[in-house]
Amino acid sequence: MKLDNMLLSFKKLLKFNIKELWLLTYAWFVFLKWDFLISFIDFKKWRAQIDNVTFENNNNGLTTNTAKLTEIKAIINISEIAGRHHIKKMNCLRRCLTQKQLLNRRGYHCNLHLGVKIEQSNLKAHSWLSFQGLVINDSEDVSSRYSELKVASEDDIFCALK
């Protein structure tokens, strides 16, 4: 049965073109980088690698066109595949930091948002990305399900997301 699953995965892999395969491989290693940093390195030492956290993204007069959004969604979808097939489960923070790095590298400067909610007396934290005000890696209603943290101790926020 395991061999059948491997063959099926390999067949799916063959559907990607070279550019997509490169992005998939690159995303897998970027996930590895962020997982290592979050898991083993003090936040203050890797904080500088994130250029903005929870700051409002303005359009600077730009409009988001369909071609940009299509490319952004394709990058996110491929990175989600890499995250699902990683050596361990990648949570929302690792996904967002990986996707942010992939998108920034291609000139799409997106914002990282951090939010919390209380569910059954437990504090739940979540992160998502937006590009020019549009949520790009989560459902549109994420900001109604989580209270976004605008000003808070980043150390506390990231510790909760670990």
Which residues are covered by each model-predicted region?
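Contiguous, function-dense segments enriched for cysteine-driven chemistry
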Residues: 68-69, 73, 113
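Hydrophobic/aromatic-rich core segments of domains that either
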Residues: 78, 97-159
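N-terminal accessory/pre-domain segments preceding catalytic cores
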Residues: 1-62, 71, 78-88, 148, ...
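Active-site neighborhoods of divalent-metal-dependent phosphate/nucleic-acid chemistry enzymes
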Residues: 84-85, 89-94, 98
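Charged/polar, low-hydrophobicity segments characteristic of intrinsically disordered regions
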Residues: 61-67, 140-143
